[in-house]
Curated annotation (Swiss-Prot):
This is UPF0175 protein APE_0276a. It comes from Aeropyrum pernix (strain ATCC 700893 / DSM 11879 / JCM 9820 / NBRC 100138 / K1). Signal peptide: none annotated. Belongs to the UPF0175 family. Pfam families: UPF0175.
Length: 89
């Protein structure tokens, strides 16, 4: 879904891919997100949005795929802020 700061693209794929009916778009989004993250083109947040997954689901997917984390200082600060807020509750 295109929104602020995003762009919609259309691609053609060959018929006969071994993907269950109705799963093609989801599978392509996940594969694209994984590869863009793996190559350092997309951040964790950008990649998980492309994949349509929560941060934690995307982290689990990265682990299953054997893709190491590219954890930036900014992401660490964000996670520490969340942890502090949760600890205060």
């Amino acid at each position: 879904m295109a929104g602020i700061g995003s762009r919609r693209i259309v691609i053609e794929v060959p018929e006969g891919l071994r993907v269950p009916p109705g799963e093609l778009e989801k599978r392509l989004r996940i594969e694209l997100a994984l590869r863009l993250y793996e190559k350092g083109i997309a951040s964790l947040g950008q990649a998980r949005k492309i994949a349509g997954l929560s941060k934690w689901d995307f982290l689990e997917l990265l682990a299953r795929e054997g893709i190491p984390l590219h954890y930036s200082e900014e992401e660490l600060k964000e996670d520490l802020e969340v942890a502090k807020k949760l600890a205060e509750k």
